[in-house]
Amino acid sequence: CTMCGRCTTVCPMGIDIAELVKEARHGMFVAGLVPERLALMDRAARQWGSPATPGEDLPDILDEVSKQHGVPIPCDLERADILVTAAPAELSDHTKALAAAAKILNRTGERGTMHQGGFDASNIGFNNGDLELQEKLTRALVDTAVKIGAKTVLLPECGHAYGAAR
């Protein structure tokens, strides 16, 4: 379960299933019953701000994605109207989604940027039930958006990014 909430939208009883899963995972986290792979991702996110890659690697990753798809993807602009975020897979295996977003922003003339300070919207803390980490990662996105003057945070369709950011 990615806690995307799609099941909730079709539940005939109106039960917020994703919220139930979130609460169950939080209880398991508090009890120390997180699977080791998720615990490893939790530790990486605490250190790097992402379970998959350190923020300092973001400029090089975006440069590679830009070359691969022939579209500029701004990184670390001091001012931007839109903070662009991604799920880890969009920075490695599924770069077309990120390139498509960059093409749309470039075509419409919107000033968007990804930023080392807050770029990963997947929020492993939300997935693991680690509420402290969830808040830290969400706060990084919000603080980065405020820092660069962004009025919009563009979230990926990773399943639970919106729920985590809310």
Model regions: which residues?
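Iron-sulfur-cluster electron-transfer modules
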Residues: 1-164
